[in-house]
Regions:
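Non-catalytic interaction/Regulatory regions outside core domains
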Residues: 1-117
Length: 117
């Protein structure tokens, strides 16, 4: 399945998802999908910086995986949004955002969408 098909599937899984992007493990964006009517909170440079930070954090977690187990996802709650980063295999990372009012049931929708890809 292509990156664009994966992004479409994830975005369709839950209307509360605002933003989805897939990048490689160097932080290079491979594809992005933004919900219609949503204005990103970060500009392109800030988004790139956030991706590099998330990728580097994921690499650190990978070093600890022998003791902690494989990283499934990282969930961060901010005042203005929630963010999930999730490895896709060993080469890619998925980053999703949604509003801070969203309940955790969104995880099941995302996981189900990724299982179909």
């Amino acid at each position: 399945m292509s990156v664009q098909e994966m992004l479409n599937s994830v975005m369709k899984s839950d209307d509360r998802i605002r933003y989805a992007t897939v990048c490689d493990m160097e932080g290079q964006v491979l594809g992005t999908k933004i919900r219609e009517g949503i204005k990103p909170l970060l500009n392109d440079e800030e988004h790139r910086e956030a991706l590099i930070y998330a990728v580097n954090s994921m690499k650190v977690r990978e070093k600890l995986s022998a003791k902690l187990g494989k990283n499934q996802y990282v969930f961060a709650v901010y005042d203005n949004l929630c963010r999930l980063t999730m490895p896709i295999g060993n080469k890619y990372m998925l980053l999703l955002t949604w509003g801070p009012e969203t309940t955790l049931d969104i995880f099941n929708n995302i996981r189900n969408a990724l299982k179909q890809t």
